[in-house]
Amino acid sequence: MTELVIMSFAFSRGEPPDANLVFDMRFLRNPHWQEPLRPLTGLDRAVGEYIAGDVAYAEALSRVEALLLTLLPLYQGDGKALVRVAFGCTGGRHRSVHVAEEVAGRLRAAGFSPRLGHRDLAAPPHVGTERSAGNGPEGLGADGC
């Protein structure tokens, strides 16, 4: 049986070198820029609701789920002992955490038994989180444009 590990991480602290599949969640709107949500994490309901309200969220998660439901049986059939699926965002506290939790839940509902971890959740937040379109105040980029 293939062991399945789902994890979240912060791109600002480096990609996990042993991940088989890495998904970048930085396209989703960033709760960091919402003052009431900033101190919370992707484990908090308010953060999850904010992220799930992004217009790209539902379709993106459905496609990730479909891809994993296609690939995981193939990995198992090939005898792969361990598959690590990593979800990243800038700080590893909001988007990646919520999505990792959501995907793990969906995979459990589909009959898999993923182990779930959040590599950078307890790490102190980084200063200078990205401000790309839709992620910063008024949608400004890091250079204010």
Residue ranges and their predicted role:
Residues A81-A104:
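Catalytic cysteine-centered active loop of the rhodanese-like fold, especially the PTP/DSP P-loop
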Residues M7, A86-G88, G117:
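Solvent-exposed beta-strand sheet faces enriched in polar/charged residues
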Residues M1-V83, A122-P125, N135-C145:
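C-terminal accessory "lid"/substrate-recognition subdomains
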Residues A104-P114:
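Post-Walker A helix-loop "phosphate-sensing" segment adjacent to the P-loop in P-loop NTPases
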Residues F112-A123:
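Short beta-strand-centered segment that lines the nucleotide-binding/catalytic pocket of NTP-utilizing
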Residues L68, L72-Q76, C89-R93, L107:
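Short leucine-rich amphipathic alpha-helical surface patches
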Residues S62, A66-L69, V97, E101, ...:
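A generic structural signal for well-ordered alpha-helical surface patches
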Residues T129:
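Nucleotide and nucleotide-moiety/phosphate-recognizing core
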